[in-house]
């Protein structure tokens, strides 16, 4: 499991949602 990759994608999505 590449949690770092997943967390990175999640971070990007959350950033877009926060805007």
Swiss-Prot record:
GO molecular function, one term: toxin activity
A single GO BP: killing of cells of another organism
Keywords: Antibiotic, Antimicrobial, Fungicide, G-protein coupled receptor impairing toxin, Immunity, Innate immunity, Mast cell degranulation, Secreted, Toxin
Tissue specificity field: Expressed by the venom gland.
Compartments, record wording: Secreted
Keyword Zinc-finger in annotation: no
Main location: secreted
GO CC entries: extracellular region
Similarity annotation: Belongs to the MCD family. Bombolitin subfamily.
Function of the molecule: Mast cell degranulating peptide. May also display antibacterial and antifungal activities. Its mast cell degranulation activity may be related to the activation of G-protein coupled receptors in mast cells as well as interaction with other proteins located in cell endosomal membranes in the mast cells.
Protein name: Bombolitin-6
Organism: Bombus lapidarius
């Amino acid at each position: 499991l590449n949690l770092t990759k997943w967390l990175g994608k999640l971070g990007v999505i959350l950033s877009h949602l926060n805007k």
